[in-house]
């Protein structure tokens, strides 16, 4: 029963703190949404495993100039793209031991099998003009790779291994002195082992008998005021297959966060305007239900979120624009994850014993 309550609390936390996008739902009250989440958690069978898919795209542009005869002008462009796919599976036998309370005999190294692939790129473009002389630098960085985690035997070592490869490609083009133009590529292969036992030892050696004291206090009334104010930007919806939370994002929301958080900027730093949302956007968080009424998938979606920022200080003008698109999907999965085999270890692999590293 406790696990069901924890699942409901987790779902509610995900839904209120963080997709896919806008769906046809009927508006409901917050109390109804909480009730539906409770019911869904009670109807959810334990997930054997899950899959995760994430994509993100962030674009930032900025212009900088000096009011003193326009001696200095600069423009900046930054593009970030990221994608991730992964899956994990729980070992049913080891999970059964945990549920029965037989934690001493759990083989934690054999508890989880997982795999992950990721691809990321960053493009940085800066142009600066000083006294009509233009300099520029363009950098493209691509980072990708894959990870696998599970228990296996390799090089006469039986343990849980985190095996991965990281591929990096960097391209630089510039007319600035001292810059190394050209393309560089690098691949690294790692095999980290004794992970579960190291974590278990760390947790087991934590002294919980003496709780340290602290003089730090948190003003709960301030947090309550902020949450109460933000509540007006949050709405709930549902249909037969989904429970949805929508968070409206606009310039008034940011202004309320600043005001209720007592965030004040000193006047001596110059004439500054707070970040302003230039395009109406929203964050959609969805909890999908299976045929039994239990949770089958969670998603978070942020699309076409646009922010602008302006700043002026002693003749220096700055204007920045940022556009954000983000999607995350976590799904229940019964598909078995491929176990680690010898073929996953490259000849160039660097074996790292985590237990030795942490000594």
Enumerate the language-model features and the residues they cover.
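Bacterial N-terminal signal peptides that target proteins for export
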Residues: 1-7
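Charge-dense, intrinsically disordered terminal/linker segments
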Residues: 8-9, 330
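Intrinsically disordered, low-complexity segments enriched in polar/charged small residues
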Residues: 9-10, 178
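C-terminal motif of bacterial Sec signal peptides marking the signal peptidase cleavage site
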Residues: 16-19
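Subset-of-secretome marker
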Residues: 21-359
């Amino acid at each position: 029963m406790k696990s069901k309550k924890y699942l409901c609390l987790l779902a509610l936390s995900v839904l209120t703190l963080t997709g896919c996008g806008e769906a046809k739902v009927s508006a409901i009250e917050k109390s109804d949404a909480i009730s539906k989440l409770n019911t869904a958690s009670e109807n959810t069978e334990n997930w054997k495993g899950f899959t995760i898919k994430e994509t993100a795209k962030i674009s930032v542009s900025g212009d900088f100039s000096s009011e003193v005869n326009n001696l200095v002008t600069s423009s900046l462009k930054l593009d970030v793209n990221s994608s991730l796919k992964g899956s994990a599976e729980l070992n049913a036998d080891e999970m059964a031991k945990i549920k029965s309370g037989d934690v001493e005999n759990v083989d934690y190294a054999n508890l989880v099998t997982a795999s992950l692939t990721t691809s990321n790129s960053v493009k940085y473009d800066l142009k600066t003009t000083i006294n009509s002389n233009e300099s520029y630098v363009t950098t493209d960085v691509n980072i990708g790779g894959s990870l696998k985690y599970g228990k296996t035997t390799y090089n006469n070592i039986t343990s849980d291994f985190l095996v991965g490869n990281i591929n990096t490609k960097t391209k630089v083009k510039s007319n600035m002195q001292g810059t190394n133009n050209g393309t560089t590529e690098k691949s690294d292969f790692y095999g980290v082992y004794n992970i579960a036992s190291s974590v278990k030892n760390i947790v087991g050696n934590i002294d919980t008998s003496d709780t340290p004291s602290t003089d730090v206090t948190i003003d709960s009334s301030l947090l309550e005021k902020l949450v109460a104010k933000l509540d007006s930007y949050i709405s709930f919806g549902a249909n037969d297959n989904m429970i949805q939370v929508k968070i409206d994002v606009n310039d008034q929301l940011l202004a309320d966060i600043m005001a209720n958080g007592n965030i004040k900027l000193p006047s001596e730093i110059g004439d500054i305007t707070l970040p302003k949302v230039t395009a109406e956007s929203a964050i959609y968080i969805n909890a999908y239900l299976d045929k039994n009424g239990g949770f089958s998938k969670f998603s978070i979606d942020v699309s076409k979120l646009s922010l602008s920022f302006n700043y002026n200080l002693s003749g220096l003008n700055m204007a920045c624009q940022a556009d954000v698109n983000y999607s995350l999907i976590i799904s229940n999965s019964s598909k078995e994850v491929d176990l680690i085999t010898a073929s996953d270890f490259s000849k160039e692999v660097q074996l790292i014993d985590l237990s030795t590293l942490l000594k």
